[in-house]
Structures are given as C-alpha cells and as structure tokens.
Swiss-Prot record:
S-S pairs: 73-158
Keywords: Antioxidant, Copper, Disulfide bond, Metal-binding, Oxidoreductase, Periplasm, Signal, Zinc
CDD domains: Cu-Zn_Superoxide_Dismutase
A GO cellular component annotation in the UniProt record: periplasmic space
Protein name, per record: Superoxide dismutase [Cu-Zn]
Subunit structure: Homodimer.
Tagged with keyword Cytoplasm: no
Binding site for Cu cation: 66, 68, 83, 137
EC number, UniProt record: 1.15.1.1
Molecular function, one GO term: superoxide dismutase activity
PROSITE patterns named among the record's database cross-references: SOD_CU_ZN_2 (PS00332)
Gene name in the database record: sodC
Family under the similarity heading: Belongs to the Cu-Zn superoxide dismutase family.
Pfam family, one: Sod_Cu
Length: 162
C-alpha cells in the first residue's frame, strides 16, 4: 500500500472516531402539532460536554435547559418525566453545583428567535446521555429548589438524544 492509501485510511478512521464523540437531539415544539425547530449537538471534551444549539423560532431571552430522564417528548413534553438525577440528589443546584445532573447552562435566545451560543456542562459525560430527553422551558432558571425546579415553567420544546 502506498503512502497516500495509508493516509486515506487513517483519515477515515479518525473521522469515524470523531463522529462517535457526538450525540444529537432533533428539537421539536411540544404543542399538539410538533414542529421541527433545529437540533442540539453534544460533544465530549476533556472539560465536560460541549452543548451546541442550532435552534430557531424560540421566544427571546433566557430559557431553562435540562436533561430529562425519559427519552419521550410526548404529551407536551410531560412523558420525559423529571430531571435526570442518577444519584438521587433531589436537588436543583445548576450545572456547576452538586445537585442533579439534568441542569444544563441556560439557553439564550436572541431577538431573532435563534439559539446558537455553545455552552459547557462540566459534570456530564457523553456516555451518560444516551436515551435521555433535552428540554427547553418557557422561562429562565434560578438553579434552586424555590420556585420548584428553578422556575423554568412550561416545556416548550423537546428532543430525544441519539
């Protein structure tokens, strides 16, 4: 095999390994007729999971952004159940606290309805995220238990992580 053949095989192998380090969730509105609004990509880094939204048609401002324990967005997002909490902390302390792992950094939506600002969830591992739901709430997030679940409010968009 010549040198260019070896380089080509190495490139293909490296590319497939890089692809394996991403998970994607197509995101849909949670209304009676769900509409596709984009996707969220999750990438493992040495510092945690990089979360890269590519979303449109959302209300401007900060939104609660969480992992939910069941990979089902049915019934207006209610089938996704509660926040992902594998250690049963029952505590909402944000992505940098010691509470449940379902807290993601707040999702910011610009005045044109787009969310594209990447964030980092330092306590998460990509291997923990298979078959979970990612949820976007109507309101911002206080990262506390008062109001309940940080005050995120209604579930306005949801996707299953694949």
């Amino acid at each position: 095999m010549n040198k260019s053949g070896i380089i080509l095989i190495g490139t293909i192998l490296f590319s497939s390994m890089a692809i394996a380090d991403d998970l994607t969730a197509p995101i849909y509105t949670t209304g009676p007729k769900p509409v596709a609004i984009g996707k969220v990509t999750f990438t493992q880094t040495p510092y945690g999971v990089l979360i890269t939204p590519d979303l449109t048609n959302l209300p401007e401002g900060p939104h609660g952004f969480h992992l939910h324990k069941t990979a089902d967005c049915g019934n207006h997002g209610m089938h996704a159940e509660g926040h992902y909490d594998p250690q049963n902390t029952n505590s909402h302390q944000g992505p940098y606290g010691n509470g449940h792992l379902g807290d993601l950094p707040v999702l910011y939506v610009t005045s044109n309805g787009k969310a594209m600002i990447p964030t980092l969830a330092p306590r998460l591992k990509l291997s923990d995220m298979h078959n979970l739901a990612v949820m976007i709430h109507a309101n911002g997030d206080t990262y506390s238990d008062n109001p309940p679940q940080g005050g995120g409010g209604d579930r306005i968009a949801c996707g299953v992580i694949k």
